[in-house]
A protein has these predicted regions:
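Solvent-exposed serine/threonine-rich low-complexity stretches and specific carbohydrate-binding patches
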Residues: 436-455
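Short, aromatic- and glycine-rich surface loops/edge beta-strands on solvent-exposed regions
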Residues: 470-482
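C-terminal membrane-anchoring or membrane-association module
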Residues: 533-561
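Conserved aromatic beta-strand anchor motif in extracellular beta-sandwich/beta-rich domains
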Residues: 426-430
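A post-motif C-terminal structural segment
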Residues: 1-5, 10, 58-401
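Surface-exposed, short loops/turns at beta-strand junctions within beta-sandwich domains
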Residues: 419, 454-456, 461-472
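C-terminal low-complexity, Ser/Thr- and acidic/Pro-rich disordered "stalk" regions positioned immediately N-terminal
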Residues: 481, 487-524
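Structural beta-strand segments of beta-rich domains
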Residues: 407-413
């Protein structure tokens, strides 16, 4: 096992407070889903947001909205635009909905139902859902059916968004968002580079450029929009919010040995931090800035003999800035006829260097000295008054209840109040003791990633049509995966029910009360002010977190990320 983390494991560490293995998202070393900050904030009645310049399914943003043993499980058809299906290669079989699992990252994103989600990765939502209640629909259509306000690659529509009671899903590019600066290329040592240093130039395709209507979508723009929407949300106004903002391509361009790309994305993150500071009151909002791992690039005195480098010209004073890259596992110098880096993503590797973390606002005193990435979870959770212990998680699920309802000839098991668990299993047994319905089937149910994904503070519905019959009695058992909370009831299947249960819509009950009562929250309020957290993160050494949370970082698709 490598001592150097990838973005999935590091993002999971601060999202859940649990260590895991590289390529895994929000599961423990046994594969059991662990509650993340977004889910816990929702359980406590707070508004939640997730902003990134990467594909929204990438590791860092995915760690705030999904649980997956493989970070590559982007959608129900794997990692494609929907024209093909490679889910068998990109996902654990037991996780797929058609096999009784909790679903892909994109599907779980909709289940998580953050109030604001902004990033890239639009093409993966054109995949077709393979199992469950939305089978046969695209993920985009599923989002609309679940009540999302959707924006696809439309800067003007993003800027026009106002809070209207719906969760926002705005994906601004098919893949990762374009970088601020056009790319540079790292090459072998060459005296000519010192004579002609490179000046970084703006990328014409960067969404931060103003369009004909004067609108743009830089990371700072998206951060401002997210905070506006969260502060307009009644939950945000009454109970605070959690927002993670990621400057993802600092890391991605470091993998590519693209100095101009890195610098532009670092500038974009810096402006996003300024935007957050301008929007919030630091008496009421904790802002944390950090990174999930270190990387290859270093500013050095002169071009090294042992590594590739780029010589830049400072736009301030014209001084030379030499950036070196030396952590690629590829044989970069094996062939003297190949003088420059080929820009294959992930050819440069992460390092184990210690990272900078900075914080301002309530709870910032916890960010002091040498810390662990899992400590970020506790800093944020304690500041917001969220559950952090096994007993507190059990308390969140203590109010779990369920019923079987029939509408339009379809029977469903409707579960609510299981807010300390990310997933659950169920069995339905008839009067003769025969199991007629079961999550995942007998073998798959033993896999921790199988079962049903909990829609925190919402009704989670399971289709039992053709499994049960009207008028007959059944024993139904529902068990939370993480807390072990279990409830068994004898239920007689009714005729048509008059009450309408809409999967994915928020429900009443004790979810918020349980969330607030279960966790100590000494900083939950300052006077009458509601606390928020913003986390800003990057995939390199220089990034940050905030408790109305903003984050910048890259979780990528390749194994080394």
């Amino acid at each position: 096992m490598t001592p150097v983390t990838d973005s999935a494991a590091s993002g999971s560490a601060w999202a859940t407070g649990t260590k895991t293995y590289n390529n895994a998202l929000d599961v423990d070393v046994y594969g059991t889903p662990q509650m993340n900050l977004t889910e816990l904030a929702k359980a406590a009645g707070k508004a939640t947001g997730n902003v990134t310049t990467s594909e929204i399914q990438d590791a860092t943003p995915a760690a705030q909205m999904s649980h997956s043993t493989l970070r590559s499980c982007y959608g129900p058809q794997g990692k494609t635009d929907g024209s093909s299906n490679n889910a068998a290669d990109q996902c654990e079989v037991a996780q797929l909905k058609e096999n009784g699992g909790i679903g892909s990252i994109s599907e779980q994103m909709l289940d998580t139902r953050a109030d604001v989600t902004i990033g890239g990765g639009a093409k993966y939502l054109h995949q077709t859902v393979q199992g469950g209640e939305y089978a046969g629909m695209t993920v985009w259509d599923q989002a609309k059916a679940m009540g999302y306000e959707t924006v696809e690659k439309d800067v003007d529509a993003l800027n026009a968004l106002q809070y209207d009671g719906k969760p926002v899903l705005a994906l601004m590019a098919d893949g990762n968002l374009q970088t601020q600066f056009a790319p540079s290329v790292a090459t072998k040592k060459d005296p000519a580079k010192d004579e002609n240093p490179i000046t970084c130039s703006t990328n014409p395709d960067w969404l931060g450029n103003k369009n004909a209507n004067g609108n743009s979508a830089s990371l700072a723009d998206m951060t401002r929009k997210a905070i506006d929407l969260l502060e307009a949300n009644p939950n945000g106004q009454s109970n605070g919010f959690f927002l993670q903002v990621e400057g993802a391509s600092i890391d991605k361009q470091d993998h590519n040995a693209n100095a101009c790309g890195q610098i532009g994305e670092t500038d974009d993150l810096d402006k996003a931090i300024s935007a957050a500071l301008d929007k919030v009151d630091l008496n009421e909002t904790l802002i944390i800035v950090t990174a999930d791992h270190a990387h290859t690039s270093q500013i050095v005195e002169e071009q090294p003999n042992y590594a590739l480098s780029t010589v830049l010209k400072s736009p301030v004073d014209g001084a030379k800035i030499t950036v070196a890259y030396g952590t690629s596992p590829d044989q970069m110098y094996a062939n003297d006829d190949a003088p420059k880096f080929d820009e294959v993503e992930s050819s440069m590797s992460h390092t184990g260097t210690q990272l900078r973390i900075a914080a301002s606002g309530p709870g910032a005193q916890r960010v002091n000295g040498l810390t662990d990435q899992t400590d970020n979870f506790y800093t944020i959770a304690k500041t917001l008054g969220l559950a952090t212990t096994a007993d507190e998680y059990k308390n969140l699920s203590a109010g779990m209840d369920f019923s079987v309802n029939v509408k339009d000839g379809k029977a469903s098991l409707d579960v609510a109040g299981l807010n300390g668990d990310a997933s659950f299993t169920y069995t339905v047994t008839d009067a003769a003791g025969q199991v007629v319905a079961q999550s995942g089937g007998t073998e798959a149910d033993a896999d921790p990633i199988s079962g049903v994904r909990v829609r925190t503070t919402q009704t989670t519905s399971v289709d039992l049509t053709d499994k049960v019959a009207e008028g007959k009695a059944y024993k139904v058992t529902v068990t939370g995966r993480q807390t072990g909370t279990s409830l068994e009831k004898e239920i007689q299947i009714p005729a048509e029910t008059t009450s309408e249960v809409i999967p994915g819509k928020p429900t009443g009950g004790n979810a918020n009360a349980a969330g607030n009562a279960s966790a100590a929250s000494p900083l939950g309020k300052t006077g009458v002010a509601i606390i928020g957290v913003v986390v800003l993160a990057a995939a390199l050494v220089s990034t940050g977190l905030a408790v109305r949370t903003i984050k910048s970082r890259r979780f990528g698709s390749a194994e080394r990320r």
